[in-house]
Structure formats: structure tokens, C-alpha cells
């Protein structure tokens, strides 16, 4: 049973989140964005 609301909804897949920053992180799955990179090997990560 959920006791909190999920006001932030992904416009692409409809998945709902309780916090805006969780939705923002989720959108990288759809966009393919990888904003974090390793300083040692230069690989990018989501």
C-alpha cells in the first residue's frame, strides 16, 4: 500500500515518481543521455 502521492509522471512511458529529480534521472533512459563521464577512461554513464 502506497502512502504517498506520485505527482511527477513521465510523458513518454507514464511511469510516476514522487520527486521531480527522480523523473529527471529517469528521462535519461529515454533520451540516451549520459551526463557523467569517468576521468580515467573517458567512458560516459547515465
Swiss-Prot record:
SUPFAM superfamilies: beta-beta-alpha zinc fingers
Gene Ontology cellular-component annotations: nucleus
Primary location recorded for the protein, binned into one broad class: nucleus
GO molecular function, one term: zinc ion binding
Superkingdom to which the source organism belongs: Eukaryota
Location of the protein in the cell: Nucleus
PROSITE patterns associated with the record: ZINC_FINGER_C2H2_1, ZINC_FINGER_C2H2_2
ZnF bounds (C2H2-type): 1-4, 8-30, 36-46
Keyword tags: DNA-binding, Metal-binding, Nucleus, Repeat, Zinc, Zinc-finger
Family statement: Belongs to the snail C2H2-type zinc-finger protein family.
Designated name of the protein: Escargot/snail protein homolog
Amino acid at each position: 500500500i502506497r502512502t504517498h502521492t506520485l505527482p511527477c509522471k513521465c510523458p513518454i512511458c507514464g511511469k510516476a515518481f514522487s520527486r521531480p529529480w527522480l523523473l529527471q534521472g529517469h528521462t535519461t533512459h529515454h533520451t540516451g543521455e549520459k551526463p557523467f563521464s569517468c576521468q580515467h577512461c573517458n567512458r560516459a554513464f547515465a
